[in-house]
């Protein structure tokens, strides 16, 4: 879900939203072995106090909340399952995963109308926010974030999960400056030959945009996440979407040509040879020849980061 972030400096909010009283079921997804105070059990949504709206889209809203007893801050993502059938898949995936490279989900509350995710609060927003603020990403910074994203993708692949929508707005940053993968609304668990095309077109790989030309196989979903990573790291370095020219209208026809037809991606001459090679391996159009996550983690551009 692409969120439209609201202004941080605003008058005190009177939130015209449903009260935090749910008669549905709840399940915790936090690790029972963790001793961190942030994993204090949340028994009910009444344990949380809404502070502000962080963002909202057609499928739901994300709130900044505070635990009434511990004062710990959380993000509360409220979705309507009847408006978006993928949210039940997202809930199932979040129950399975726990990694320091992926945003943490502490609990999910289910009611007749809403699906509510109690999430780790990422204080510095997303990579998309940083790009809008014209933050400059040096090569070492890009290398570090690429390493973290690859670590997260490796974990997901071991769990048999294709993220399916790696893009700047789904890569969140905490107060330590650590980037974590978020939003599993377009994700799927690889089984039964399901190679659907949910996700954001601009970050889709050629085989997802044009299945007839490129074909598909058991690794195609994972290879698509690698392509998306390549687009993201290059976008962070040059400060804009890298597959189209400045001034191009980002419609379907333009994106299709940029992703599937253009011979090569323009990479600035200021990039190091290591960076150019890394991006080239990510943005190989034939998914059969594209580097895997494991191969990229051994690449000199991200190794030992």
UniProtKB/Swiss-Prot annotation:
Pfam families, per the entry: Pkinase
Annotated Protein kinase domain residues: 48-302
Keyword NAD: no
UniProt cross-references to SUPFAM superfamilies, sorted A to Z: Protein kinase-like (PK-like) (SSF56112)
Leading EC class: transferase
Database matches in InterPro entries: Kinase-like_dom_sf, Prot_kinase_dom, Protein_kinase_ATP_BS, Ser/Thr_kinase_AS, Ser_Thr_kinase
List of catalytic residues: 165
GO MF annotation terms: ATP binding; MAP kinase kinase activity; protein serine kinase activity; protein serine/threonine kinase activity; protein tyrosine kinase activity
Chain positions with Phosphoserine modification: 34
Binding site for ATP: 54-62, 77
Family, as annotated: Belongs to the protein kinase superfamily. STE Ser/Thr protein kinase family. MAP kinase kinase subfamily.
Protein name listed in UniProt: Mitogen-activated protein kinase kinase 10
